[in-house]
Amino acid sequence: MSRPLRIIPLGGMGEIGKNLTVVEFGGKIVVIDCGLAFPRDEMLGIDLVLPDISYLRSRQDDILGILLTHGHEDHFGALPFVLRDVNVPVYGSRLTLAFAKSKLDEHGLLKCVDINEVSESSRFRLGPFDVGFVAVSHSVPDSLAIVLRTPLGTLVHSGDYKFDHTPIDGRITDVNSLARLGDEGVLVLLADSTNADVEGSSGSESQVGHAFHQIFAEAEGRVIMASFASNIHRIQQAIHIAHLHGRVFAVSGRSMVKNVNISRNLGYLDVPEGAMIRLTEIDDYPPERLLILTTGSQGEPLSALSRMAYDDHPQVALEPGDTVVISAKPVPGNEVSVMNTVNRLLKGGARVIYGPETGVHVSGHAAREDQRMLLNLVKPRFFLPAHGEYRHQYLQADLARQAGMPDDHVIILENGDVLSITPDKAEVTDKVRAGMVYVDGLELGSAEHVVVRDRQRLAENGILIAVVTISVQTGELLAEPEIEARGFLYDDDFRTQVLQEARDELVERLQELASEHITGQRLLQEDVSEVLGRFIHKRTRRQPLVLPVIVEV
């Protein structure tokens, strides 16, 4: 019986972000991508979300390397956290590694990591894997699909891709290489599902330039343009077209400044002589000659654009006559934040251009016709829709079945599923631990951690603090309990009444405990929490977090 090829996603299935896929053959492992996700609104105080890599820790001696598809943080952003535990070689294209190295340097890890540059022409062996790459178009330059040839068959991972026939840098998705792989025979394809609910084909990045020309021609004041800092092609178009219209540009936002400098130094960004000025110099130029490139297209509260909108930016004060262009689509979950920013910008007197009908954004992901084309080119025996919410995976799985693939050859995986593939069969044979790890300041914690639950409870129901002073010898109450409430009980009179009733209820229970000679700190804390929690719920239908403080004298 032949050894199976095993595919184990630890992130990126049924969700947007934290993409990380384990590929295993003959007891050896390569990892494709190592991404993070950004916290949802209910993840209070959380900075970042990482995939749980418990499985990789348990197999770290078998891991041969991490292969990166491209330079977006949902595909490489977890590297500084993962490499602390599993320090293995990292492979990626030139720009992808430049972004990754900058992130590693921030964490003091750059000198500790074995980093290897590859391109679409690279081919090498990692244990039982013959590793190759295919050039693909995406919203960040230098993106790659990954090809793993094994004795059992070939795996192709699309990464994020689309078929752009007129890309800004002239680097198209290599359909000839994909077709050759299809002719050779592909055992399994993992493909980007993000736009499986979008009919037709994704538009070319160059289309955005037409809208930019019109905006710069019509704008009488400054143009402030927000986009993803990694969308170097978008930034290139903005710089080039602004220059044609007689405008210089400045850059605002830490990640935008960093990525512009990296891309310029590596030759991915062409800046005309004299076109770039410092942000501190913008007052030296008339408004009609200025473009300001900024972060904040997702309405992030601390981003440069949000600070402009709320009149909190140290260099850029919003002025009537400004034209603000939001050249990005809100990531699911960010819609409210983006609209709040738009509202503030409009109140500040700016003209705001955003939304699909304006032509200022095209997606970097394959739509349904593109996905159908990839399936027809690669002709996989087994197909795994990846990188998307369940609805995206479902729709792309349905697309594969429409293309003639048998039902049992199209598999929708969940994070942690262990898919075992032989030449004739693919089935989930096991499950490993996979979930979310939260980055909270300098700490890492699991999604189930009590800290996060406490924050959610505080936000939803408030807190009740009870200070009880008792005799250490007898357990008798030495003073009336002090009870304070925050985050509920809005009416002052009702609040006073409820808290007094709560004190009376608590005193009665504490007297019972004293008569029974129960004086242990933990037992008293549990009783105080139970009595107050039950009483407050009965009187208010709220369940605040009860924090008992026992003072023994």
Placement of each model-derived feature along the sequence:
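Conserved hydrophobic residues forming the short capping helix/wall of the S-adenosyl-L-methionine
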Residues: 104, 400, 536
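Short Gly/Ser/Thr- and Asp/Glu-enriched loop/turn motifs at secondary-structure junctions
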Residues: 119, 414, 542-546
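Short glycine-rich phosphate-binding loop at a beta-alpha junction
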Residues: 89, 384, 547
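Hard-cation-handling environments
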Residues: 197-327, 331-356, 360-517, 525, ...
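C-terminal tails and terminal domains of large nucleic-acid-associated
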Residues: 517-553
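A glycine- and charged-residue-rich anion-binding loop/surface
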Residues: 13, 37-41, 62-63, 354-357, ...
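His/Asp/Glu-rich metal-coordinating catalytic cores
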Residues: 1-67, 72-285, 303-317, 336-340
